[in-house]
């Protein structure tokens, strides 16, 4: 009986690996062709009627996108902008629903959206949808002149004014040299060239990212950002100057 069980497991492993060997090249070609079409203007991101700032990453795993979105939203609100946030609502019960966040429970909108709501101004509008273009257009119609895309780096269907990419300790992992499902990368590292700003997060866990860019900033966000509404502005540790002074 044990021999049969082992044989079945080996066959399952063989089938799984065979499927991955087939899927990986197809996935890689899709990423390459999609980016090529956008880079040469064959496909174009759609404008939504407001300035758009995307906060994303290039690897799987948490790099602090939501806390950074919170800090940026609060900074912009404080400086007179009407801010809207687009979130897919990861972990919510019904992912097909599209709605402006009001009094929905965490089950309806996802825990990340609740974190956004509890740590931003009451005037900041949050739209939950898988369709980022639709959500951003709705926020623009509601009077938002700046829309933040939470996790939007790979979503090129929407035109953006600023692309912010967060790099955490995950980016030092050897798995980051390979594309998912063989590694942690969502797309090859060469596509970081699309980023206007790269930010190193979780600096206490990072030795050296290897990036040598004038637009690379060391980011320090206090831990209270995850549990408190009193969020400090983000500063460049090298010069202590306030960030997010974008010409919008």
Listing of model-derived features with the role each one plays in the protein:
Residues 90-92, 96-208:
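Phosphate/Mg2+-binding loops and adjacent switch elements
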Residues 35-101, 204, 240:
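Walker A (P-loop) phosphate-binding motif
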Residues 2-51:
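A transmembrane-helix-recognition feature enriched in membrane-embedded lipid enzymes
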Residues 84-86, 165, 242-248:
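Conserved beta-strand elements of the Class I
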Residues 55, 167, 217-219:
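Hydrophobic residues at beta-strand termini and immediately following loops
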Residues 49, 80, 123, 195, ...:
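A generic structural signal for alpha->beta connector loops
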Residues 3-10, 173-248:
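C-terminal accessory "lid"/substrate-recognition subdomains
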Residues 81-83, 163, 214-216:
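Hydrophobic anchor at the start of a short beta-strand
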């Amino acid at each position: 009986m044990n021999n049969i069980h082992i044989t079945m497991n080996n066959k399952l492993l063989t089938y799984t690996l065979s499927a991955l060997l087939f899927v990986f090249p197809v996935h890689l070609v899709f990423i390459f062709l999609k980016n090529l079409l956008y880079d040469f203007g064959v496909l174009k991101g759609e404008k939504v009627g407001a300035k758009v700032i995307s906060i994303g990453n290039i690897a799987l795993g948490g790099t602090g996108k939501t806390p950074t979105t919170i800090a940026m939203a609060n900074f912009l609100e404080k400086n007179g902008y009407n801010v809207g946030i687009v979130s897919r609502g990861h972990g919510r019960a019904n992912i097909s629903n599209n709605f402006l966040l009001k009094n929905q429970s965490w089950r309806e909108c996802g825990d990340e959206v609740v974190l956004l709501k509890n740590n931003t101004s009451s005037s900041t509008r949050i739209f939950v949808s898988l369709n980022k273009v639709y959500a951003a257009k709705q926020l623009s119609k509601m009077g938002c002149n700046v829309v933040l895309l939470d996790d939007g780096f790979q979503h090129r269907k929407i035109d953006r004014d600023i692309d912010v990419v967060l790099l955490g300790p995950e980016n030092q992992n050897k798995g980051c040299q390979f594309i998912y499902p063989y590694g942690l990368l969502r797309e090859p590292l060469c596509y970081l060239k699309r980023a206007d700003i790269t930010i190193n997060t979780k600096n206490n866990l990072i030795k050296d990212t290897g990036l040598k860019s004038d637009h690379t900033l060391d980011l320090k966000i206090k831990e209270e950002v995850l549990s408190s509404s009193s969020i400090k502005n983000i500063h460049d540790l090298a010069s202590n100057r306030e960030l997010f002074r974008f010409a919008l």
